[in-house]
């Protein structure tokens, strides 16, 4: 889109094209040329609004038509796009964006669009109790969420009405009536633009505070650099550092082709080898963590031979007992204990199984002998009872008790 085409475009088309660029820059990163083109288009919109005299200082929001409400957002959109421009002199960008936001805020204040609590906070210059500032931010956040919800509701309502209109157009012809009223003059369109302006006011106040702090920080850094006699990092110095880093990495990559470093022995790799059967637990491994030595004991070399050396070594020692082995050694010890326990359990199971099979015939023989003994005892008992019955016939002991006896 060349300059001639931009000059020939009407205000409404130019505004919509610039707003699309602003939307794309807000949702995702765009090229700097596109951002600058959007700034030029919004500046052209400002010039056309001034030439057409769409707004007056003695007007309020009720006096502005629905078609012209959206043009109140031009300074805000221009400020946001300007803030996204990347250049070396960041302070100039911050100042330009801050000026446009102040212009937008002042114009909304004249149109009676800014809430009273925001006007009071602006008159105080940001000073006040922390609780008051916190309450103001909470109220601003609630207004922002309410405006976003309102815009979403209007958008969904338009989509539903569009679908129903399309369906009715396919079934019956459209009659002239209320559906012929332009959307630009409808209350819904006006409500949508007012909600957009309220949302922009909330975001503009937060952006003003952020830009003010950024300008103060950049000014302080610049003053310090001027005071120290430094103009900042020069481009040559940065290029020199980059070349040195690239050379070092290139040389390191060349050396790695001819030198193969030894594989470090770590506890993790040793334990993995033990678990997968490539190494035995009994094999010592080189990763040893020696316990820390504190106090004078750290400067005493060799064993403690005299009582004096032992007393010196006990000075400034920890109040708790130090570990006698590292975690890796403790794990290997536990693994040894587990392997011994498994071997003993396996051996006991094998012995129990073997003895059970070997003792089975002997147990069967003993059981047979016990059964034979029990049979003989039963026969002898039965024979003795038969002999007793022969010696004592039935009723022999009751003869003296009978009347005829």
UniProtKB/Swiss-Prot annotation:
Polar residues composition-biased segments: 165-174
Disulfide bonds: none
GO biological process, one term: positive regulation of TOR signaling
Expression across tissues: Ubiquitous. Highly expressed in seed, and particularly in the embryo.
The organism's place on the tree of life at top rank: Eukaryota
Sequence segments annotated as region (Disordered): 159-189, 352-405
Acidic residues: bias regions: 176-189, 367-377
Annotated knockout phenotype: RNAi plants show the formation of spontaneous disease-like nectrotic lesions leading to premature cell death. The defective plants also display a strong reduction in protein synthesis, the induction of autophagy and nitrogen mobilization.
Induction: By chilling. By abscisic acid (ABA).
Record-stated family: Belongs to the IGBP1/TAP42 family.
Protein name according to UniProt: PP2A regulatory subunit TAP46
Organism: Arabidopsis thaliana (Mouse-ear cress)
Taxonomic classification: Eukaryota, Viridiplantae, Streptophyta, Embryophyta, Tracheophyta
Record gene name: TAP46
